Amino acid sequence: MTDPVGVSRISPEQVFKMFQVFGERRSGTNFASALLSKNTPLKEVSQFGWKHGIPSFPVFPKSCLFVVILRDPIDWLKALYRAPFEVAPGIQDLPFREFIRCEWESVYTPRKSGWRGHGYELDFSLGRGEILQLDRHPVEGRRYRNVLELRNVKLAGHLSLLSRSTNCVVVRYEDVNRDPEHLLSVVRDVFRIPVRDKALLLKQRVGPSSPKQNAITDLSAADMEHIKKHLDLAQELRCGYPL
């Protein structure tokens, strides 16, 4: 079994009641949530912040298991480009070479109660198209210089859960997708959370669908050079993604 990227277990005797998944768009967050919901007694929650955002909440309870799921940066870029989510219209229509080089902006998508369920109070009269502040730089408030800086900062934020005195496990989407029981084994063996003896595995896609707009298979040498120049390569290596 492949080891997880990281584990934080702060209270050996803790009884867990719930779990929340964090991870960037197109990284398998819905897959991980469905797997845990079907195979553990834990309640899935989203009240401790937007799962695609940087974790920030007054208190993270010890009774919650936080799960962070990551994805290979190249596969993630291709998936995000193929089906962008909450991305400003001017960006989602760009050719790939411009998509990875332009300043990033995300837009607010109204939901009946979704944002409130994430722990936020919002004016629900706001329409689609308002700036999504959770996808701006968390300190400087500016747009990210490009989607690669967005990944660097938000990945660092997700990994910070390992240092926030939380019960947390960080896994790679590739490992869980190849062997779904990988995550369940960690949950059982490390956190002593009961799982089904015979795991219920997912047979179809989970999560909301979105229009597939663009597809890209091969990256140009110039695009790869740009990606390597702007990604935090040390952080990617820590996560098991050498470039």
Q: Where in the sequence are the language-model features?
A:
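Short acidic donor-binding/metal-coordinating loop in glycosyltransferase active sites
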Residues: 173
